[in-house]
Amino acid sequence: MTELEQKFINARRQAIALDYANLNDMQQQGTMATEGPLLLLAGAGSGKTTVLIHRVANLLRYGRGSDTDEIPIPISEDEVAFLEAYAAQPTPEQRPLMQYLCAVEPARPWEVLAITFTNKAANELKERLERMLGEEARDVWASTFHSACVRILRRDIEQIGYSRDFTIYDTDDSKRVVKDCLKELELDEKTFPVREIVSVISRAKDEMLLPEDFRAYWEKNNDWRKIRIAKVYSLYTKKLRDANALDFDDIILLTVQLLQSRPEVREYYQRKFRYVLVDEYQDTNHLQYLLTSLLAGGYRNICVVGDDDQSIYRFRGANIENILSFEKEYRGARVIRLEQNYRSTQN
């Protein structure tokens, strides 16, 4: 690398960093480290949502410009001098040229998948991105796990034997179907409570245990009660399939099965999503871990944000091991800790 090229790269990073001058050092690093696997460890009040929003904005404005030594355009001393002057005293008139010089393959909005755990968090992400970037932010895939999977299934579920107009069953629907199954199998609800069976089926799906696998496991262990629950699980699955219906767990399970079994579908989404971001990663369960691994398997540009000290979703099968083993799963991953607590500071 020539001295001129090094000066340009340094000036480019300084110019981009001005966009995030209101962030602290670690937040700025989390925003500008765009390439490869990244683990952001962030407790409550550390500004992680702000980092996620700035990170997406950075990807759309500059692509990998803040995290590469690549120079895709011819440069001279003039470009270096311009960026150095901009970094010292920026003006609005200079901004278009600055963005042109600093951008390296900026991501298109639909190439960014940002997954959150709640609709409220997803909507907040969309609203704040739109305020920052305008209408183009609407095309970012900012959604919950279930919403993202429904979009994928509406496009491709026919490849695994369902029709695209599938119905989604809520918890009450699932309980109703389980009740019907118990009645058909002549099993007493007092011995086999509906809520318990719904929970057992949900956990089985999270572990990708299909009815036949579930039954074989408990037959091997000679568990009379679980063998009967396996019969309920099998009949429950048949009833949903006959109705072209999915329960909440099926939405993610079938998406994972689709991506695993159909290489062309998997490759389509791996090409589509250049950048995958996952919030509250410590709360992901086994299926959600598999899903994000599959979707990020093309570019490996996956950024996960989480707190390694808490897991409020443990009752839903959350596996905190997903965050603790991230560096082992993704060789070469960078780890950044957002340790300053702004809520405490404000108090």
Question: PLM features: what roles do these ranges have?
Answer:
Residues 58, 280-286, 310-314:
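Residues immediately C-terminal
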Residues 286-301, 318-325:
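Short, conserved "post-DEAD/DEAH" coupling segment immediately C-terminal to helicase motif II
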Residues 1-163, 168, 267, 321, ...:
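P-loop NTPase Walker
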Residues 119, 180, 310-347:
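Conserved coupling/interface region of RecA-like P-loop/ASCE motor cores
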Residues 22, 89-98, 145-149, 227-275, ...:
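Conserved helicase/translocase P-loop NTPase motor core
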Residues 30, 34, 117, 136-140, ...:
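ATP-hydrolysis module of ASCE/P-loop NTPase motor domains
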Residues 36, 107-111, 136-139, 298-301, ...:
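Short glycine-/polar-rich loops that comprise or flank the Walker A/P-loop
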Residues 272, 280, 307:
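Walker B catalytic acidic pair
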